[in-house]
Amino acid sequence: MSLTSIICGIALLTIGEVGPQNMPDTIEPVESPFVMPLFERPVFPESTILVRMEQEGMSTKPIQEAIDSMSCRGGGTVVVPPGVWRTGRLILKSHVNLHLSEGAELRFSGNIIDYLPAVFTRDEGVELYSLGACLYADGQENIALTGKGKVVGPPTSCEIYKCNESMSSDKVIRKPLADRIYDGKNGEGVFLPKTFAPINCKNVFVEGVTFERGLYWNIVPQYCEHILIRGITVNSFGHGRTDGIDIDSSNDVLIEYCSLDCQDDCYTMKSGRGKDGLKVNRPTSNVVIRKSIALRGAGGIVCGTEIAGGVRNVYMYDCVFEGTDQAFRFKTRRPRGGFVENIYVERVRANVKRQALYCDMLGSARWVGELAQRYPAREITPLTPWFANISIHDVEITGCSTLVDVSALPEKPVKNSFFGNVKAHCDRIGKICDATKFSMKDVRIESCDTVMRIDNCDYASFFGFSNVTTGSSVKIEKTGGECRYLNVQTYPLVPVNYQSIRPGEVWLDTEGKPIQAHGFQVT
């Protein structure tokens, strides 16, 4: 029997209908389960400076002087004409649009001296002073990077990369912030520069640019407000620890019509790590991602691992994952603190290599030692992370080795999660460990596996969880810890239609009376 009927009436976009090539000029209104601001294309003063390339050597000076001059005049556009521009770190300034013409290529240096002096930044959730970013800004308003040009990072054979080999943010957290200076001098190493990473900025706009061969994370707004990222392309697969877009302790974000091909995570939410992140206490919140592509990479949409300040209110819809390891990836570790809540994902096509839904709160013994062991349940402290209110529905999954892989904490189970209206091809169905109120509804799979294993899962419910290959319902097997108030209901394998229900909408029973529910209803 075909699985096509399982998402009957709910249109899933194809890879040819999303991404930069489909970006319209206008910005469509944002409809989300939470309140979002109005997003409009920023308008800059009409003043323009056309940068002239130096005859020899680096072009850092003429580009930076043009940016500084334009900002002092009150703002405008700095145009980088076609050509290969060798440059060091560039610092964006208020009310300036750095526009890369088609055929323009900013090719960033791999030498430490071209990124000095050290600037304030955050590395893997820890504040410090180091090289910052290839394109950096601190405390600015109304900054933009636009155009059809390219931003190309340094090669991994460069001086910067070699001086980072022994560096870890774990080494700096015991120092006061003023002493966390890593500029490559006096035998100190450096922290890798991100590609585009404004910090403490308002009204950040990125459109149309291609990012290639990033040395580290690519687009990383930190402590920023009102961010619009549209129509960008990241090509960094096979080149370092290259996340695509990391929203780090920032809020009011719209990401649309993007394409990410990364070595690491693609669309990622972060907010600091451990005690350092708790001290800063700035969440990532109100993020909408739509009509975008994730190609290769560790995860399609990701929360973690650095979530000490919290991640809340994230909505992804009408996206395509084509080749990521995992589709929906939630990860942290016991001593990192923070939370993830109110995550909504719908209408996603995902062709993945490993898990479709992946949640890991234990981590690896390599990083946290015995804390990676599930038992004994630990005492709850401010550094105990928690996940709650995750809703994923109206999705089609192919190629995955495991449909669901949830390993939460016995002392802090993941709460109120919903996975429904799913059709999937998978080798294994998977497991859920340490969850409360975990619901799977109308999930139809093609698999030779027949069993979903659950452990310490209270108030779990499985409605219409069917295997088309075997022609029977998936068996729910309790292993290990007690699973109280388990609810399993089966439906016949017949074609049905579904109507998507957005969070906050009311369901009515057959007599027109409101009922409590979430996800979708059979019609």
Q: Where do the language-model regions lie?
A:
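Generic long, charged, amphipathic alpha-helical segments
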Residues: E370-A372, P376-E396
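A beta-strand-loop signature enriched in Asp, Gly, Thr, and Trp
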Residues: Y315-Y317, E322-E379
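Active-site-proximal loop/turn and secondary-structure-junction residues that shape catalytic pockets
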Residues: V84, T233, S271-R273, T305-I307, ...
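Right-handed parallel beta-helix
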Residues: E102-G103, E141-K150, K202-E212, E225-S236, ...
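Hydrophobic core segments of beta-strands in well-ordered, beta-rich domains
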Residues: V522-T523
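Short glycine/acidic-rich loop motifs that flank beta-strands on beta-rich extracellular proteins
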Residues: G75, T87-R89, S109-G110, L131, ...
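Short, contiguous acidic/charged loop-to-helix segments that flank catalytic cores in large enzymes
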Residues: G304-I307, K331-G337, Y375-T384, S407-P410, ...
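Extracellular "leader-to-stem" segments immediately downstream of a signal peptide or signal-anchor
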Residues: T4-V79, V84-G88, K93-N97, S101-N200, ...
